[in-house]
Amino acid sequence: MSKATCIMVQGTMSGAGKSLLCAALCRIFAQDGWRVAPFKSQNMALNSFVTRDGLEMGRAQVVQAQAAGVEPDVRMNPILLKPSSDIGSQVIVNGEVRGQMPAAEYFRRKKQLIPDILAAYNSLAEDFDIIVIEGAGSPAEINLKSEDIVNMGLAKLVDAPVLLVGDIDRGGVFAQLFGTVELLEPDERARIKGLIINKFRGDVGILRPGLAMLEEKTHLPVFGVVPYLKADIEDEDSLSDRLQVKNAVKPLDAAIVRLPHISNFTDFMPLEQHPLLGVRYVQTTRELGTPDCVILPGTKNTVDDLLWLRQCGLEAAISKLAQRGTPVLGVCGGYQMLGQTLADPEGAESGRPQTLRGLGLLPTQTTFAAEKRRTQSQATVTAAPFAGAHLTGYEIHTGRTTVQGAPFCTLADGTPEGSVQGQVFGTYLHGLFDSGELTEQFAAYLCRRKGIDPAAAAPISMQEYRTQQLDLLADGVRHNLDLAAVYAAMGLAQPAERGNDQ
């Protein structure tokens, strides 16, 4: 079997649009008939996913795999860093936790992971035709280049041609692109085959003099000017923008607590798409107000975030709302917080042995341990008023929770999962709203409580919605990128049947 060819997308900065451009290329190449896989050697993210094999990887490569029409595979993201504090991260290699590591220590040791990176990449390259590689941040971070394993360092290891993308929406795109190229070594510059300007609004004709000058100064062609596309696809940067939403503009008000170490808040994207649900993220009691429901999301540090919740007054405010009958939902770390006690006898979660009281809204006790549970799950909700809703999700957590009372749902093997007491619900299952059934019943339940006709609460299938948005993204990129030049950079001919509509 011949080895795959590849193309790498690097950016002038974080947020330039690398992840979504890679997703678009995965979609385009798959539409053109190629077997495509994404790859990012090292990803730093709070939002992760569990594969069918029970291994953990970054969600950006999950989205890119979905764009390519293939199942997410941990080989697509061999190193995942999950920040657990301001100076340290949990290091996950090939889907398994290697441990907590301060940033300085990881920087010194990360080149030791090159064999893992190459093994994952080479294995993928045996199974696919094209590998779409995503860089991280900027290749011109000259203080980090000596230990680089994700930008030009990786490009050299796998002999990848590079597309360099700059974000015009934030201004200074010509300086971004020119400055980045100038800071690279000659052999690194030689890897760049073309420049891309991303997130453009307006008449591209205004840019043409600047494009010509940029090409003259960098001796590199501009492969395209991609407009600011409205495709609603999760990536780390757009997700961060979602956390800024403070006001509900729909009939139902769902307040999600923005914990300091919030993670996997992709769980709530289906709620955001619902026509009646206004989702907002809150950090203070004033912002919390009197919503129609409160959601405590997952967190990378349950103990620290519980203490923060207590100190800022949100614990007391949420407890008062619950006493008045306001529905409260906790997911993963949020579920743990809702219980009676959280014990950390080995310091696995907090770094020192301790036991904390929870919010006391659910009859549960959680004990933390070093071993992490990672699994995909199917379940049927048993908790009224959502009984009968089927959902597919996944678990990523270190705590083990014992429940006195009714479960939230029953797993496919008959195991009870989660907890419910009155209008307070808790579950470990991430992705619980993706299938649409629980979203529908959740919205209808809130509608009935507020006297709104639930007929408008139509089910939302995230799979269908995501497919539509990926097609929208791919079409926008296909029409504005010189795909013939991209194919030529990979040493391939562009398939004639699709062509390029630029």
Where are these regions (language model features)?
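Conserved P-loop NTPase catalytic core
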Residues: A348-T375
